[in-house]
């Protein structure tokens, strides 16, 4: 077997400071972890509410595993559909205010499955230019015509929709991140709702980074912006603010039935194990209650504090609304140098490079958790300012 081609590509990536590798973290996803045996402040986890080591989730996982075993043995359409799956789906539908919900094994599997399952060659998908990679791949798998509009630019989107209108054959769908994963900014959902009504199409929101975090009840970006019930398809994850693993779509009953029959990532995957599903149920109960509200309030205070310390280093659109803080650094080499220096100082924050972000828009992507301590964040902000000015 010829391996030279792949090795040359890896060598080129290394020369360009673009080679990715794995770092070994020990312990739970707390505010501090052991990174290669060294204590560091964890500033790059999506465990926004700090639920990944919550005693209620751990106990629920252990109880379900003792009762139901470690795995389901098959896909949901064979023998892998359990009462726990249905309980969590019912709670998620109620949480998002929809008729029904359907679990997927990961956010990537959800977006690719939803778009591939619902859309086809006669359909058109309108997709924000900074949507997550799983949405981009889902659009490709669907075989629908994909029209990409400039980031958050609803005026440009309307022009593109008007241009497509005379050619319309099938279903139209607008798809957007709710909270954009690399910039932390919000989709203009009220304006997108107006467009979807004007052009009689569907609106799908990937709220992986908003679910559990935004809104008085943690229902996400739609609740925060006052248009939750106008969203047709809500995609969310259980592996970020909810502290577990898996993903879901919530929407009309007919959509869920259709996806059960057409979404390949659902049909051909062994279902989520009982312990994982039970943790999702426990997490949702916390998010819905007073503890979840208190954690969101604390997280918001920390977001305001941290972004306020780094105002000069952040894009102007960053206002501390979300726990994603993009600290722009430009090119790969200074980005990775800054990340390595901060790691040596006990701050674990990853450098983000293309293709995850556009050329020239490399960054340190800091993410906050409700369990972070003020003094740790102040020290981290001071060190970030120092490395950026070096």
Swiss-Prot record:
CDD domains, per the entry: KBL_like (cd06454)
Domain of life: Bacteria
Residue numbers bearing the N6-(pyridoxal phosphate)lysine modification: 240
Catalytic activity: 6-carboxyhexanoyl-[ACP] + L-alanine + H(+) = (8S)-8-amino-7-oxononanoate + holo-[ACP] + CO2
InterPro entries in the cross-refs: Aminotrans_II_pyridoxalP_BS, Aminotransferase_I/II_large, AON_synthase_class-II, AONS_Archaea/Proteobacteria, PyrdxlP-dep_Trfase, PyrdxlP-dep_Trfase_major, PyrdxlP-dep_Trfase_small
Necessary cofactors: pyridoxal 5'-phosphate
Enzyme class: transferase
Any one of the GO BP annotations: biotin biosynthetic process
Keywords for this protein: Biotin biosynthesis, Pyridoxal phosphate, Transferase
Binding site for pyridoxal 5'-phosphate: 107-108, 181, 206-209, 237-240
Residues binding substrate, per UniProt: 20, 132, 356
MF terms (GO), sorted A to Z: 8-amino-7-oxononanoate synthase activity; pyridoxal phosphate binding
Pathway(s) annotated for this protein in UniProt: Cofactor biosynthesis; biotin biosynthesis
Segments forming a coiled coil: none
Keyword Transferase: yes
EC number: 2.3.1.47
Summary of the function given for this chain in its UniProt record: Catalyzes the decarboxylative condensation of pimeloyl-[acyl-carrier protein] and L-alanine to produce 8-amino-7-oxononanoate (AON), [acyl-carrier protein], and carbon dioxide.
Subunit structure: Homodimer.
Assigned protein family: Belongs to the class-II pyridoxal-phosphate-dependent aminotransferase family. BioF subfamily.
UniProt protein name: Putative 8-amino-7-oxononanoate synthase
Organism per entry: Syntrophotalea carbinolica (strain DSM 2380 / NBRC 103641 / GraBd1) (Pelobacter carbinolicus)
Recorded name of the encoding gene: bioF
């Amino acid at each position: 077997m010829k391996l030279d081609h792949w090795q040359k590509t890896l060598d080129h990536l290394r020369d360009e400071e673009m080679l990715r590798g794995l770092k070994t973290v020990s312990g739970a996803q707390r505010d501090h972890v052991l990174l290669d045996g060294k204590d560091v402040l964890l500033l790059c986890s999506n465990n926004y509410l700090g639920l990944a080591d919550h005693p209620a989730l751990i106990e629920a996982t252990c109880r379900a595993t003792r009762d139901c075993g470690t795995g389901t043995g098959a896909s949901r359409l064979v023998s892998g559909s359990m009462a726990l799956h249905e309980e969590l789906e019912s709670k998620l539908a109620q949480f998002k205010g929809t008729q029904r919900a359907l679990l997927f094994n990961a956010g990537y599997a959800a977006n690719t499955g939803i778009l591939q399952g619902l859309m086809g060659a006669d359909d058109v998908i309108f997709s924000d230019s900074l949507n997550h990679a799983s949405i981009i791949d889902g659009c490709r798998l669907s075989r629908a015509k994909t029209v990409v509009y400039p980031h958050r630019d609803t005026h440009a989107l309307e022009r593109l929709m008007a241009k497509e209108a005379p050619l319309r054959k099938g279903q139209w769908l607008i798809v957007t991140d709710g909270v954009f994963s690399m910039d932390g900014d919000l989709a203009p959902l009220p304006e997108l709702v107006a467009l979807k009504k004007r052009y009689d199409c569907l609106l799908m929101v990937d709220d992986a980074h908003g679910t559990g975090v935004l809104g008085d009840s943690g229902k996400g970006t739609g609740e925060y912006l006052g248009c939750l019930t106008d969203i047709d398809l809500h995609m969310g994850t259980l592996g970020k603010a909810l502290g577990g693993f898996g993903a879901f779509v919530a929407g009309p009953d007919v959509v869920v039935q259709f996806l059960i029959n057409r979404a390949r990532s659902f049909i051909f995957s062994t279902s989520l194990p009982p312990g994982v599903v039970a943790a999702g149920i426990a997490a949702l109960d916390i998010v819905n209650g007073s503890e979840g509200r208190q954690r969101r309030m604390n997280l918001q205070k920390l977001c305001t504090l941290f972004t306020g310390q780094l105002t000069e280093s952040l894009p102007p659109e960053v206002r501390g609304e979300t726990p994603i803080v993009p600290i722009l650094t430009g090119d790969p080499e200074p980005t990775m140098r800054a990340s390595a220096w901060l790691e040596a100082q006990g701050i674990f924050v990853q450098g983000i490079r293309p293709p995850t972000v556009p050329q020239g828009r490399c960054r340190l992507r800091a993410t906050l958790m409700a369990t972070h301590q003020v003094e740790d964040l102040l020290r981290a902000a001071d060190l970030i300012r120092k490395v950026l000015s070096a």
